């Protein structure tokens, strides 16, 4: 079954912030990082349930899963939920950030 993937406005803003941060330091790396991230997001079109539940999944009424992207010091957690045949990317957080609290996440309606 193929899933549609939608990136929420909050996740889009977080991706943009990370891209700009990397671009200010190394434009080539930023472009490579962004292309890799988009390719990783695209993998959620097939078998998104292969990804583990997020550490914080019990805080939320819906199942929240995570997909890790990157290596070394550039690992990001893509937090998402699945509704029917749509995968919603909720947040994109650096792996070094503290775990989520319930008030950090608004699920799309």
PLM regions and their residue ranges:
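A generic structural signal for ordered secondary structure
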Residues: 19, 30-34, 48, 82-87
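Residue-level recognition of specific faces of alpha-helices
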Residues: 14, 40-43, 66, 88
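Enriched for short, Lys/Arg-rich terminal
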Residues: 1, 69-109
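Short, hydrophobic secondary-structure boundary micro-motifs
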Residues: 31-32, 52-56, 100-101
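Generic hydrophobic/packing signal
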Residues: 14, 23-25, 29, 49-52, ...
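Arg/Lys-rich, positively charged N-terminal/basic patches that mediate binding to nucleic acids
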Residues: 1-36, 40, 109
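Basic/aromatic recognition patch in beta-strand/loop cores that engages polyanionic ligands
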Residues: 46-86
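Generic structural signal for secondary-structure transition and capping sites
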Residues: 20, 27, 42, 46-50, ...
């Amino acid at each position: 079954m193929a899933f549609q993937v939608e990136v929420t406005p909050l996740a889009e803003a977080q991706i943009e912030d990370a891209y700009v941060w990397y671009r200010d330091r190394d434009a080539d790396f930023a472009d490579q990082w962004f292309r890799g991230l988009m390719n990783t997001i695209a993998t959620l079109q097939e078998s998104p349930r292969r990804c583990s539940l997020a550490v914080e999944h019990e805080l939320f009424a819906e199942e929240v899963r995570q997909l890790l992207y990157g290596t070394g010091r550039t690992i990001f957690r893509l937090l998402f939920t699945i509704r029917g045949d749509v995968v919603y990317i909720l947040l994109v957080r650096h792996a070094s950030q503290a775990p989520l609290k319930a008030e950090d996440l608004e699920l799309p309606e």
